Amino acid sequence: IKLSQGAKPGHGGMLMAPKVTPEIAEARGVPAYQDVISPSRHSEFSTPNELLTFASKLRDLAGGKPVGIKLCIGHPWEIISIVRAMVDSGVMLDFITVDGSEGGTGAAPVEFTDNIGSPLRDALIFVDNCLRGAGLRDRVKIAASAKIVSAYDIVRHCALAEDAFAADSLR
């Protein structure tokens, strides 16, 4: 469940017209080769507890497959409130993908790229500390997503906190 992205926190998704092939257009129910703008908020939830209810529903619909969130840490209270809701409700996310502020999308406003949100290193440590402090670190996996371009980046982020990573290409 994508909550935010490092290159454009608070902005919805934008799929540029050249990428909206007939196959993608059919799957999304939109015209081919026209920009597709997705809203920045989910209609299914607006609070951490509603997020967890939605995640649980998705997990059930997917036959028990793992469900998690992707976010760029902007306001620390956002992840703190999600972790608190997991503690209070007992409903867990299976993973949290932490996206660093190091932008990696052509759809981001230039002034946002690399400048908004927490850098991946700091964000990984923060999310790991939140989960450890709540006693949930062994139940919730952490994935990293940002400019991970080398084997060194992978080793460094694994040493910091991550259990998995997402990278477009490695050198």
Per-segment meaning from a language model:
Residues 43-171:
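Glycine-rich phosphate/ribose-binding loops and adjacent secondary-structure elements
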